[in-house]
């Protein structure tokens, strides 16, 4: 695919990561590391493709409880917390039960569309009001 993008001197790759890359968050170290790897890869790729008129972009969605993302695990995230961390984790899970801002599916779709159609060299597209707030704070 990259060979064709170089030959046409056009094209865009949009990778979707997470707002965990915008600010350190507790209880998400491994998940954050996996998303940061994609961010680093995409940032480097953007430089490489840019020399050929193609682009790479990142969409960073916020917390989306309506996506049922955690249901894909097949078990409760709270049940995965080791006992020594239970007291530390409790208020974090309580805060996630009633977040002040969330990301909806439409927020992500809009950010992907914007990233795919933006001819600039902008790399980051936070998706959802919570992700936008984190990006501005960072």
Where are these regions (language model features)?
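SDR active-site lid
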Residues: 51-122
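A short helix-coil junction within the Rossmann-fold of NAD(P)-dependent oxidoreductases
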Residues: 1-9
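Alpha-helical segment proximal to the catalytic Tyr-Lys
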Residues: 3, 47-48
């Amino acid at each position: 695919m990259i060979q064709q993008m170089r030959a046409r001197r056009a094209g865009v790759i949009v990778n979707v990561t997470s707002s965990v890359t915008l600010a350190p968050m507790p209880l998400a170290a491994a998940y954050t590391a996996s998303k940061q790897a994609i961010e680093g890869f995409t940032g480097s790729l953007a430089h490489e493709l840019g020399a050929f008129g193609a682009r790479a972009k990142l969409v960073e969605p916020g917390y989306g409880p309506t996506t049922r993302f955690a249901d894909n695990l097949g078990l409760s995230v709270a049940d995965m917390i080791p006992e020594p961390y239970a007291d530390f984790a409790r208020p974090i899970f309580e805060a996630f039960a009633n977040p002040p801002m969330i990301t909806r599916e439409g927020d992500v779709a809009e950010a992907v569309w914007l990233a795919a159609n933006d001819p600039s060299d902008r790399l980051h597209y936070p998706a959802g009001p919570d992700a936008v707030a984190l990006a501005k704070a960072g």
